[in-house]
């Protein structure tokens, strides 16, 4: 608020001179202090992707907000439309209990945004999801534990060997 008030004073030439003395430095000083207060009050957010453990860690000002498995963090191509039916796309970093972070603002170019989203997801080694809920363009690198379908992972059959089954193996 101090920043805005001092900016108005400087731009409107208010308090430039009081009783024949130059006083423009007071609003300028107030503007600098207001800007410093505004920037210092923004809390620092930090997202750590630990690929060796398969976990992510999200904190604000050093205090842990949430942590969980990697399959809960992803890059999503989001769709927005205007009143005239125009389609605009943006890339958003999302996750469970994470504040959505817009990585790339609105663009009409679907192919370029999809390429960039896939590239970012590959470099960060996280999942990528298209704007459609069910699409063949999704890239899933991390699956939840105990998922019914997880390509590349074959679930073991828990077979108990009995004496008759062991005898069948004899040649």
From Swiss-Prot:
GO cellular component terms, semicolon-separated: CatSper complex; sperm principal piece
Entry keywords, A to Z: Cell membrane, Cell projection, Cilium, Flagellum, Membrane, Transmembrane, Transmembrane helix
Domain of life: Eukaryota
Cell compartment(s), UniProt: Cell projection, Cilium, Flagellum membrane
Keyword Transmembrane attributed: yes
Pfam families in the record: TMEM249
Coiled coil: none
Membrane topology term: Multi-pass membrane protein
PANTHER family: CATION CHANNEL SPERM-ASSOCIATED AUXILIARY SUBUNIT TMEM249, TRANSMEMBRANE PROTEIN 249
The protein's role, per its UniProt record: Auxiliary component of the CatSper complex, a complex involved in sperm cell hyperactivation.
Subunit structure: Component of the CatSper complex or CatSpermasome composed of the core pore-forming members CATSPER1, CATSPER2, CATSPER3 and CATSPER4 as well as auxiliary members CATSPERB, CATSPERG2, CATSPERD, CATSPERE, CATSPERZ, C2CD6/CATSPERT, SLCO6C1, TMEM249, TMEM262 and EFCAB9. HSPA1 may be an additional auxiliary complex member. The core complex members CATSPER1, CATSPER2, CATSPER3 and CATSPER4 form a heterotetrameric channel.
Identification of the protein by name: Cation channel sperm-associated auxiliary subunit TMEM249
Organism, as annotated: Mus musculus
Native organism taxonomy: Eukaryota, Metazoa, Chordata, Craniata, Vertebrata
Name of the encoding gene: Tmem249
